[in-house]
Amino acid sequence: MKIKDWNRSLKVRLVGEFFMNTSFWMVFPFLAIYFAEEFGKGLAGMLLIISQIFSVAANLFGGYFADRFGRKRMLVSAAVAQGFAFLLFALANSPWLTSPELSFVAFTLAGMCGSLYWPASQAMIADVIPEKYRSDVFAVFYTTLNIAVVIGPLFGAVLFFSYRFELLLTVAIISVLLGLLLRFYTEETLSAEVLEKWKEGNATGWRGALLTQVKDYGIILKDRVFLLFVIAGILGAQTFMQLDLVIPVYLKETIDRQTILDFLGREWSVTGETSFGILLAENGLIVALLTVVITRWMTKFPEKWVFFFSALLFGLSMAIFPMTSWFWIFFVAMAVFTFAELMVVGLQQSFISKLAPESMRGQYFAAASLRYTIGRMIAPISIPMTAWFGFGWTFIILGSFAVLSGFVYLWMFHLYDKRTVANI
């Protein structure tokens, strides 16, 4: 399905979200450094964990609100609110005021607004795109996000430290403009029947709404197929989240200075730090260039085996890293790692939309994100594991988690196929 054939709302979002994501990634990668300098590493770490907890809660509420009030209303409200949060962030770093405490509050609010935005954005795609094309569309949005992730920090490395107030003010303006763009140039995609169903519900007041939400998420987690999907995702996250955890630490300790190319009498050498930068660029370049191509290729195969072999390749990439200290082997391992990532990036989002009833799509997407949020909380344990077991065993254990996730996916599809046959 070509972009020109998309619903107008998705075209508007694709452009607007690219600029929003690019500006966001000019700020986000440098916040850990900023808060560590202002509060100290220990307190900064605790504050970032607290911020993450608020974002998880907001994400779950975002799913409920997207199903209850509609996709468009949530997207507009979250984008504008995020703009005001960044405006507060800018004020806390302005010529008139310098307040790290207010900066943390503003950052937390901005993160919560982003978490409110995400479930509605995913559900909107599932609302308007036929099932057979959803993987392609999710892949295109993923590609633009990763281009933003590559471009944003390049500018942010200069702007965040030298022109922080101006940068944060710009991000605030872009967020509000995105909200206005969504307000006037997108349409509501949640069906009128579903909205009417919510209006006829029995929940009254905020207590009733909260009880209804808890009940709905309870129903979702009783879905054994979906629960296995989340469990497999948490296991797999222990591998792919090592890109900015154990992998850079290993490279730094393994490569002192190594010649990677000798051409016409000139040598090119890398250190552990520069080698990680090259591998990160490799990952970003492959994602930017090949996400849509690989996603379309993978749709030709059964989802069960795509999920399974993606998990095996993640495990293989982890096994390759400790085998050597040669940079080019690391380069190959990163290619395997990235290919495994791209095999499932569109298919998994499409699979969630197939599991979710139309009236609960937002909540399903929100609950599915638990595989990342819980995985992100557990993944840093890999760092002390290197002290307990050494790098070799740490990589083997991480790779084993990935392989185990593959077998969980097989069990999940066994139950899914049984359910599908029973519903025929």
Swiss-Prot record:
<keyword id="KW-0813">Transport</keyword>
<keyword id="KW-0739">Sodium transport</keyword>
<feature type="transmembrane region" description="Helical">
    <location>
        <begin position="227"/>
        <end position="247"/>
    </location>
</feature>
<keyword id="KW-1003">Cell membrane</keyword>
<feature type="transmembrane region" description="Helical">
    <location>
        <begin position="274"/>
        <end position="294"/>
    </location>
</feature>
<keyword id="KW-0633">Potassium transport</keyword>
<dbReference type="GO" id="GO:0006814">
    <property type="term" value="P:sodium ion transport"/>
</dbReference>
<feature type="transmembrane region" description="Helical">
    <location>
        <begin position="105"/>
        <end position="125"/>
    </location>
</feature>
<dbReference type="InterPro" id="IPR011701">
    <property type="entry name" value="MFS"/>
</dbReference>
<keyword id="KW-0050">Antiport</keyword>
<dbReference type="InterPro" id="IPR005829">
    <property type="entry name" value="Sugar_transporter_CS"/>
</dbReference>
<protein>
    <recommendedName>
        <fullName>Na(+), Li(+), K(+)/H(+) antiporter</fullName>
    </recommendedName>
</protein>
<keyword id="KW-0915">Sodium</keyword>
<comment type="similarity">
    <text>Belongs to the major facilitator superfamily.</text>
</comment>
<feature type="transmembrane region" description="Helical">
    <location>
        <begin position="74"/>
        <end position="94"/>
    </location>
</feature>
<dbReference type="GO" id="GO:0005886">
    <property type="term" value="C:plasma membrane"/>
</dbReference>
<keyword id="KW-0046">Antibiotic resistance</keyword>
<feature type="transmembrane region" description="Helical">
    <location>
        <begin position="141"/>
        <end position="161"/>
    </location>
</feature>
<feature type="transmembrane region" description="Helical">
    <location>
        <begin position="327"/>
        <end position="347"/>
    </location>
</feature>
<dbReference type="GO" id="GO:0006813">
    <property type="term" value="P:potassium ion transport"/>
</dbReference>
<dbReference type="InterPro" id="IPR036259">
    <property type="entry name" value="MFS_trans_sf"/>
</dbReference>
<feature type="transmembrane region" description="Helical">
    <location>
        <begin position="42"/>
        <end position="62"/>
    </location>
</feature>
<feature type="transmembrane region" description="Helical">
    <location>
        <begin position="393"/>
        <end position="415"/>
    </location>
</feature>
<feature type="transmembrane region" description="Helical">
    <location>
        <begin position="305"/>
        <end position="325"/>
    </location>
</feature>
<keyword id="KW-1133">Transmembrane helix</keyword>
<keyword id="KW-0472">Membrane</keyword>
<keyword id="KW-0812">Transmembrane</keyword>
<keyword id="KW-0630">Potassium</keyword>
<feature type="transmembrane region" description="Helical">
    <location>
        <begin position="367"/>
        <end position="389"/>
    </location>
</feature>
<dbReference type="InterPro" id="IPR020846">
    <property type="entry name" value="MFS_dom"/>
</dbReference>
<dbReference type="InterPro" id="IPR050171">
    <property type="entry name" value="MFS_Transporters"/>
</dbReference>
<feature type="transmembrane region" description="Helical">
    <location>
        <begin position="165"/>
        <end position="185"/>
    </location>
</feature>
<feature type="transmembrane region" description="Helical">
    <location>
        <begin position="15"/>
        <end position="35"/>
    </location>
</feature>
<comment type="function">
    <text>Exhibits dual functions as a Na(+)(Li(+)/K(+))/H(+) antiporter and a multidrug efflux pump. Catalyzes the efflux of Na(+), Li(+) and K(+) in exchange for external protons. Shows a preference for Na(+), followed by K(+) and Li(+). Can also function as a multidrug efflux pump. Transports ethidium bromide and norfloxacin.</text>
</comment>
<keyword id="KW-0406">Ion transport</keyword>
<dbReference type="GO" id="GO:0046677">
    <property type="term" value="P:response to antibiotic"/>
</dbReference>
<dbReference type="Pfam" id="PF07690">
    <property type="entry name" value="MFS_1"/>
</dbReference>
<dbReference type="GO" id="GO:0015297">
    <property type="term" value="F:antiporter activity"/>
</dbReference>
